Amino acid sequence: MKYIGAHVSAAGGLANAPARAAEIGATAFALFTKNQRQWRAAPLTPQVIDDFKIACEKYHFSAAQILPHDSYLINLGHPVSEALEKSRDAFLDEMQRCEQLGLTLLNFHPGSHLMQIAQEDCLARIAESINIALAQTEGVTAVIENTAGQGSNLGFEFEQLAAIIDGVEDKSRVGVCIDTCHAFAAGYDLRTPEACEKTFSEFGKIVGFQYLRGMHLNDAKSAFGSRVDRHHSLGEGNIGHDAFRWIMQDGRFDGIPLILETINPDIWAEEIAWLKAQQIAEAMA
């Protein structure tokens, strides 16, 4: 079964997120558990935690269907020790919030070397940052998102994702989230079914599908191989509809959150309905 949804707002309280997801016909959703542009947040209260869990149960969302995203400020590969510690503390807090909420995944951007340390050193710092957080939490998997490779961001090559995983001690609690826009901008072609098969065959060999714990389904305003991160609505960008139809009809993408971060929330319900329809078309073929 495919879990299909979008990154919904938690404005007014975390318990509002499941309701907003249900309103657009989603069977999965992503959210921020705190303000993504601030370092600190008030601790979760028992009431907030209970309300969120009750809402998830009411709208039939299990932890496997929810892909929280951490703060954009965090850089787990930061070259400066003080800033690295600040990011590690914030990441641990994000992991602990997920643990409190009964969530089992935390999606994050791996990190940037800021042109100050070698790529290999940055990747090693990211892996060690994950190890530190995993040692102090239980039940939450750290889900590394591939990037477009903009600026000094790492994680844009499958080999980089594999290198981070290789440095993580508890392989059972690390995974990846593949963002289609980011992959395309990083030079992984997705414009035809044949291109999709080639790209994901490469992913399977280098990273492994056993580590795929979620996806972000986004078309791309940015050009192929441009290393520029610009999302677009499905079928309106440079990737086109074929990739998303192909994903919907491939069983390797079952049972994980498939999350829209496309640019027009007003048509998320339509995009979700279209994605669902591709599965039906395959079943009837």
UniProtKB/Swiss-Prot annotation:
InterPro entries: AP_endonuc_2 (IPR001719), AP_endonuc_F2_Zn_BS (IPR018246), Xyl_isomerase-like_sf (IPR036237), Xyl_isomerase-like_TIM-brl (IPR013022). Keywords: DNA damage, DNA repair, Endonuclease, Hydrolase, Metal-binding, Nuclease, Zinc. It comes from the Bacteria. PROSITE patterns: AP_NUCLEASE_F2_1, AP_NUCLEASE_F2_2, AP_NUCLEASE_F2_3, AP_NUCLEASE_F2_4. Zn(2+) 3 binds at H182, D229, H231. Zn(2+) 1 binds at H69, H109, E145. It catalyses: Endonucleolytic cleavage to 5'-phosphooligonucleotide end-products. GO terms for molecular function: deoxyribonuclease IV (phage-T4-induced) activity; DNA binding; DNA-(apurinic or apyrimidinic site) endonuclease activity; phosphoric diester hydrolase activity; zinc ion binding. Binds 3 Zn(2+) ions. It is an enzyme of class 3 (hydrolase). One of its GO terms (biological process) is base-excision repair. Pfam families: AP_endonuc_2. Its cofactor is Zn(2+). Zn(2+) 2 binds at E145, D179, H216, E261. Its EC number is 3.1.21.2. Gene3D superfamilies: Divalent-metal-dependent TIM barrel enzymes. Endonuclease IV plays a role in DNA repair. It cleaves phosphodiester bonds at apurinic or apyrimidinic (AP) sites, generating a 3'-hydroxyl group and a 5'-terminal sugar phosphate. Belongs to the AP endonuclease 2 family. PANTHER family: APURINIC-APYRIMIDINIC ENDONUCLEASE, ENDONUCLEASE IV ENDODEOXYRIBONUCLEASE IV. This is Probable endonuclease 4. The gene is nfo.
